[in-house]
Amino acid sequence: MPYQVTPTPLEGVLVLEPKVFGDARGYFFESFNARDFAQATGLERPFVQDNHSKSARGVLRGLHYQVQHPQGKLVRVTQGSVFDVAVDIRPQSTTYGQWFGLELKADNKKQLWIPEGLAHGFLVTSDTAEFLYKTTDYWMPEFERSLAWNDPTAGVDWPLAELAPLQPSLAAKDAAAKSWDQLRQEW
């Protein structure tokens, strides 16, 4: 099996570690194979869109989700490192209201599967980071929402000390993100 799969404390969120073949020349690994993904996770998902972002140290993207056409995401870092976060906003979930975060790095090649219906975001902890994600539905800006990265109900413990003296750099839509209480009526 080319993936080692580790469940996280959040229902349905999985850490995937691909099998890497390396020698003095470098390394090779399959970053995605639909058959192997389904076999390793028990999930069959039609990925329809790939996204690639490059961000500077301190950039915080998220916490994003779509109220209609929710997106499952398979995410990884190809350069640098990020602290990647999923927040369970599914009212019927056994882990509703909880969050999980881990460091994704180009060096560790870990990937995170975030099922449909969770809010997702990341904080760049290296000088720059390139972040790739596969999604199970298309981006639809009219349905996109942002949960405030520092919402006390979500309670995400971002590694801000690593950035000092920088503060998170946010896009306008993320700076204007709403609170848990403002958004939960749509869940």
Language model segments and positions:
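Short beta-strand His + acidic residue motifs that chelate non-heme Fe in jelly-roll/DSBH
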Residues: 112, 120-125
